[in-house]
Regions:
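Core catalytic alpha/beta fold that binds nucleotide/phospho-ligands
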Residues: 1-253
Length: 253
C-alpha cells in the first residue's frame, strides 16, 4: 500500500481550520489506517451504521492530522492531555502544540485544528416543546427573559447558539460539565448580542485562568456551530471534505 499525505492549507498560528464532513455515510471506509483499539471500538457498536460512521470519522481525522504534521496516518499515536482531551504524541516542533477537536450532529461532523487549545460544537436548530423548562435549568435570569421575549424561530436559534457556546468552552478547557456554571456568564453575553440583532461573530471572555475567544461559525442556517480558542486566533477558515481524503484527488475546497 502506498502511503499518501494530503497537501493541506497552511495552518497559521492565528487561525483555526474548521473541516466539515457533511455526510459520513457516503464516504468510503478504510480500516487499514486505524489502530487495533479503533477497530475494536468500531466493532463494539451494535448497529452497523454507527460502526461505519465511527470508522469513517476516525479515518478522516487521521488523514487530516497526517496532512498537517507530515506523518503517515497509520503511524499517528494518540494520547490524552492532563484534562483528558485527545492529543497526538511524539511530535516535533512546530506541531507539539497542535490541538484538535471533533463534533457530531445528525448528518454533519466537524473537525477543528489550531496551534492552541480549541473546542468545537454543532447542534441542529429545531423547536423543542420543553425548551422553556430546559433553559431554566442552566441559564441566567437575564438570558431566560431574553429568550422568552423572542419569537419562536429566533428563540430556537438563540437557544442552540447559547448552548454551543457553553459546550465549546467546556471542551476547550477540558472541564466538562463542571465548566457550565462559569459558562452561564458566557451565554449571557452571547444572548445579549443576539438580542441586539447586530453582527457579532466573535467575543472574548475571561475566567479565573485565562481569556477565551468565541466564534459563531455556522456553515448552514439549520445548524448552530461555535468555536472556542485563544485570543491570539484572529479568524477561522472552513473547508469541506469532498470525498475520502486518502485519494490522490483534491480532498478539500
Amino acid at each position: 500500500m502506498i502511503a499518501l499525505l494530503l497537501a493541506l492549507p497552511v495552518l497559521a498560528d492565528d487561525q483555526v481550520h474548521l473541516w466539515i464532513l457533511p455526510e459520513p455515510e457516503e464516504f468510503e471506509v478504510d480500516r487499514s489506517i486505524l489502530s487495533v483499539d479503533e477497530i475494536h471500538r468500531a466493532n463494539s457498536f451494535s448497529r452497523e451504521r454507527d460502526a461505519r460512521r465511527f470508522s469513517v470519522c476516525r479515518s478522516v481525522l487521521r488523514d487530516l492530522l497526517a496532512g498537517y504534521v507530515s506523518v503517515v496516518a497509520n503511524d499517528l499515536e494518540f494520547g490524552k492531555t492532563a484534562t483528558g482531551k485527545s492529543s497526538l504524541t511524539g511530535l516535533d516542533e512546530p506541531w507539539k502544540k497542535l490541538s484538535f477537536n471533533e463534533a457530531h450532529c445528525d448528518g454533519m461532523v466537524l473537525f477543528a485544528f489550531a496551534q492552541t487549545e480549541v473546542g468545537v460544537d454543532v447542534e441542529r436548530i429545531q423547536w423543542l416543546p420543553d425548551m422553556g423548562e430546559i433553559v431554566t435549568l442552566y441559564a441566567t435570569q437575564s438570558e431566560i427573559r431574553c429568550l422568552l421575549e423572542l419569537q419562536r424561530p429566533s428563540r430556537a436559534s438563540v437557544f442552540f447558539r447559547s448552548w454551543t457556546m457553553r459546550e465549546v468552552y467546556a471542551k476547550r478547557t477540558g472541564k466538562g460539565l463542571a465548566a457550565f456554571e462559569t459558562a452561564k456568564e458566557i451565554a449571557g453575553i452571547w444572548s445579549a448580542a443576539v438580542r441586539r440583532i447586530s453582527p457579532f461573530d466573535r467575543f472574548d471572555f475571561q475566567d479565573e485562568a485565562s481569556v477565551h475567544r468565541f466564534f459563531d461559525c455556522s456553515p448552514r442556517s439549520e445548524y448552530a456551530v461555535a468555536l472556542c480558542t485563544a485570543t491570539e486566533v484572529e479568524s477561522f477558515i472552513s473547508f469541506e471534505v469532498k470525498r475520502f481524503v486518502r485519494t490522490t484527488e483534491a480532498a478539500w475546497r
